[in-house]
UniProtKB/Swiss-Prot annotation:
Protein name: Peptidyl-lysine N-acetyltransferase YjaB
PANTHER family documented for this protein: PEPTIDYL-LYSINE N-ACETYLTRANSFERASE YJAB
Domain of life the protein comes from: Bacteria
Higher taxonomy: Bacteria, Pseudomonadati, Pseudomonadota, Gammaproteobacteria, Enterobacterales
NCBIfam families to which the protein is assigned, alphabetical: PRK10514.1
Role, per record: N-epsilon-lysine acetyltransferase that catalyzes acetylation of a large number of proteins.
Length: 145
């Protein structure tokens, strides 16, 4: 499968929300149902308007996306149906061309993502007991050396 990376388009907001939903359901089983619903509401409002980088197939079908703010990767979500095919790696490598000192945060309980970032060469620089919304889901702070 050929993958290209491009900017997101407003009209594909629903597809990107669906990728977020399926990715979270596949990797974030530690979230409470109530908090998962709260996050989905926030994401549903935010994603269609966000300046995302999207990984698309040669049919221009989104299969993953990343949000980059300056040198910080705020989000990386891959459709679970295509995980393990290097799409996350491609998006991170794209981010590194734009922000060589890339940082990100990852839920400590998301062991698949923690392993992915460590394999990519990221180093842990710190830890927070709470997530960005102050909930008790610890975050690891990572940087690409």
């Amino acid at each position: 499968m050929m993958i290209n990376i491009r900017r997101s388009r407003h009209e594909e907001g629903e597809k990107l929300i669906a990728i977020w939903r399926r990715s979270v359901d596949a990797t974030h089983d530690f979230l409470s149902n109530a908090y998962r619903a709260e996050l989905e509401e926030l994401v549903s409002d935010f994603l269609p308007e966000a300046p995302l980088w999207v990984a698309v197939t040669d049919q221009d079908e989104p299969v993953g996306f990343m949000l980059l703010t300056g040198e910080h990767m705020d989000a990386l979500f891959i459709d679970p149906d295509v995980r393990g095919q290097g799409i996350g790696k491609m998006l991170v490598e794209h981010a590194l061309t734009l922000a060589p000192g890339l940082t990100t945060n990852v839920n400590e309980q998301n062991t698949q993502a923690v392993g992915f970032y460590k394999k990519m060469g990221f180093k842990v620089t710190g830890r927070s007991e709470v997530d960005d919304l102050g909930k008790p889901y610890p975050l690891l702070n990572l940087i690409y050396p």
